[in-house]
């Protein structure tokens, strides 16, 4: 669920970490099969398509790693019964999560349907989300300077926001390279 106002339990986070591991394994298999496929292409095509293929794989791997880096510290925090996120953090991150999920679904549909005519809109959306996430980080840093709340909780929160920002950025790059792979 994208509602961070409800308490996240350790088993939910463990489930996410297990799913991340499954995605990592799947991506490694896809990369191996793709590597074999690239070797069967004509040299010039193999060079060009191979580059985009490997870049796409790298961006997909980075997305998976960012989700893991977002989840692991959160799980440790929950497992150690540290203070939960405060109401402002929960509300702000919950709103951003909804927007990011919508964005990710839009990007996935674009790649799955191989329809990139709205690519510019997706790029504009990624910049907007990145700017909003940067604003969340700045707001949190101001709260830390004002010494309101737990620094440990703030560090977990800042990590969550940073990794969410990475997911947005890597996804935009994945869509761009996917278009190049398909169209060029």
What label would you give each PLM region?
Residues 2-184:
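Cytosolic, long alpha-helical scaffolding segments
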């Amino acid at each position: 669920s994208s509602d961070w106002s409800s308490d996240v339990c350790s088993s939910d986070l463990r489930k996410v970490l297990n799913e991340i591991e499954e995605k990592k394994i799947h991506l490694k298999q896809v990369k191996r099969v793709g590597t074999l496929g690239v070797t069967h292409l004509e040299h010039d095509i193999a060079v060009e398509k191979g580059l985009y293929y490997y870049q796409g794989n790298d961006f997909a791997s980075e997305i998976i790693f960012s989700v893991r880096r977002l989840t692991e510290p959160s799980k440790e925090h929950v497992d150690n019964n540290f203070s939960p996120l405060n109401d402002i953090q929960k509300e702000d991150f919950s709103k951003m999560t909804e927007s990011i999920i919508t964005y990710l679904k839009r990007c996935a549909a674009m790649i799955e349907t191989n329809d990139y005519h709205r690519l510019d809109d997706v790029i504009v959306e990624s910049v907007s989300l990145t700017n909003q996430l940067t604003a969340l980080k700045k707001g949190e840093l101001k709260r830390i300077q004002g010494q309101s709340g737990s620094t440990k909780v703030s560090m977990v929160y800042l990590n969550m926001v940073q990794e969410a920002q990475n997911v947005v950025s890597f996804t935009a790059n994945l869509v761009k390279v996917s278009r190049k792979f398909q169209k060029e």
